[in-house]
Amino acid sequence: MYNFTEEQLASMKKVEATREERLNNLFPRMSAEEKDAVLKENHPDYIESAYENLKVGPNAGDKVLHELAALLQGKSRVLGKTIDLDNPDYEADVLVIGGGGAGSSAAITANANGAKVIMVTKLRIGDANTMMAEGGIQAADKPNDSPAIHYLDAFGGGHFAAKPVLLEKLVTEAPDAIKWLSDLGVMFDKDKDGNMITTHGGGTSRKRMHACKDYSGAEIMRTLRDEVLNRGIQVVDFTAAIEIIKDENGNAAGAVLLNMETGEIMVAKAKTVIICTGGAGRLHYQGFPTSNHYGATADGLVLAYRAGAKLLYADTLQYHPTGVAEPTQVFGALVTEKVRSLGAQLVNKDGKAFVYSLETRDVTAASIIRECNKRGEGVKTTDGVGVWLDTPMIEMIGGEGTIEKRIPAMMRMFANYGIDIRKTPILVYPTLHYQNGGIDIDGNCMSTTVNNLFVAGEAVGGIHGRNRLMGNSLLDIIVFGRDAGKAAAEQAKKVTVGKLTLSHVDEFEKKLEDAGIKPEKLSPQLLPDYTRKDM
């Protein structure tokens, strides 16, 4: 049994006492006006002091978080180094930067379209946020659903800010993405007749969440990684891209690489480049914990920005409502939304529900922050404060064995610390989860401002608008990974690479100097900084 405090145990008894009553009395959904109010008053995206305006680059004048601004306007790692661009160490038709779900999908598809592909990844293939995804992947492939309904759910959930051409691509290609994954060997949950089981997510009007228990991302990544390796695609691991190389015509034409183990600098020349570097959770914006993997440090945004790529919605992040608040050993780890879709309710220290559990993620997160901070109704934890996620309700609704069958990974994670989520509620608080914004692309997955630079996955801005619905990120890495891979392979057939240059890096440095910026922070950051500053 986990060593809960006396205060936590007393609060837990109140949760148990109200459970039966709450089972038949769902908390009402918010009106549009109530949602706007709770967001503006409580969501981290609305804390003006956390932001600054960029002074140089394609997005000069736009606001971004301080941590990201320091990297976008940071010091290039290639300055002062002699780099031989005339004798590249690697040459390919398509260079894929990143080894997660988007990068793997892109590499597989580019290879299938006849391109010579090289994948570089600063960690290992599969060390990515894809592995951390739990709940599932959306696709409107049931008789009562359609891509049009999926579009409306996602467009509204993203505050009507998504780029229509990108969102349309996401929802219309979703059913084929599920089929592609299934054909590759992904083992989705099915009923006894072989039909895929689907569930709701926050903000969905239909059950369209396809899952692999509660380790959907790991199962998808396992399958994609195997396909990359089975195809014999060259993977250069523990090697980071630290600068995009352009040719004399201003087109993306490769990358400067850094061996993470030896420090060796190398050059990769390519006809097209695909950035699939994922998110930025390990920058710990505003001091938040994160559900992200160790390498999520916004590298792709930095590389693209210095090369002249415009960003879109870089000021907006997703804070997943339910990160672990206790035990401290897994502080910030993801508690999948599927827990709530199966019936678990969010309740305060007195056992009272305070929000409909499947509101959109930003609204739910803001409601939890309000309950804990402004209202003072949270439960004290080792690292701060949290609210209860009443997991025993799942088996009251679905019957004994539901938790072990539907969310076994979640059950095991808490069992490691002596918490049986079938009998005991768990403490949660929002955790930094997803980069809503990213690099601005067109309908062909190419940067709107840099030719031959393609982007897929979490590094893209505009697919989800200003908030993402559950299950649409695992979907976008497949849809846009495949499309970027195909588009890059086709584009490579038309490209003749000019003389390689890094002149854009020197030009960016001059703009920083002219703006009075003396960057001290090396960028891209590559790895999180957890060194103590007070030693």
Positions of predicted regions on the chain:
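Extreme N-terminal leader/targeting segments of oxidoreductases
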Residues: 1-93
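An anion/pyrophosphate-binding glycine-rich loop and adjacent beta-alpha core
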Residues: 1-21, 25, 309-420, 487-493
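Glycine- and aromatic-enriched mobile tails/lids
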Residues: 1-3, 76-77, 82-93, 101, ...
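Helix-rich C-terminal "cap"/substrate-channel and partner-interaction subdomain
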Residues: 17, 21, 41-60, 379-413, ...
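Conserved redox-cofactor binding core of oxidoreductases
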Residues: 46-65, 71, 183-264, 269, ...
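Short hydrophobic core segments
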Residues: 94-97, 267-278, 455
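Glycine-rich active-site loop/strand segments that organize a redox cofactor
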Residues: 139-170
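Glycine-rich loop(s) and the adjacent beta-strand/alpha-helix scaffold that form part
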Residues: 272-329, 333, 471-487
